[in-house]
Amino acid sequence: MGRMSDQPARWTEATVYPDMWTDPDNDPRESDGPSPDGELPTLLDFLSGYRITLRMKCEGLDPEQLARRSVPPSTMSLLGLVRHLAEVELDWRGWIEGESIPKLYGKKDADFEGAVADQAVVDAAYADLEREQAATDAALAARPDLGERLKNGTSIRELMVHRIEEYARHCGHADLLRECVDGRVGQ
């Protein structure tokens, strides 16, 4: 662990609310409109917010910063989180479709271990995440009944809540990882 002076100074772009990532006028998660009506639109709204948050935590960083590991022995990095969430989106689609889909990155933990400081790896990770999110979203759009049970016994509702929980948990990790990289803070 480095000395205190080795740590980046904490900072935020926000001027209105210093505990935020950016000011409300610049925050893509902010909406002046009413909150969604209904359970499914509410779940989708929360999921969207966490997806945007993950992207925001990674913005402005180069491949080395994105691939920087957290605290040993962890292999966690911001780039690893992007790859991991692409992998779990693929897994969820397998649940929905009732079939086993081959892993994107191979063996267990390859999503984190393969997160290296290479622009091609970064570009591929973002492309994988966008593709897998869209594919899982499309598979779920065909099943609007939240009470429907999948082949493995999981309800669509449970899957949606699990997706939100997975993104929320990893956005918390991303908060800490980003602060360690360059000191930027804010929710």
PLM ranges: what are they?
Residues A110-G147, E158-R163:
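Acidic/histidine-rich alpha-helical segments that form the ligand environment
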Residues D37-L43, V122-D123:
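Active-site rim elements
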Residues G2-N26, E30-D32, L40-D111, L150-Q187:
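Short, contiguous alpha-helical
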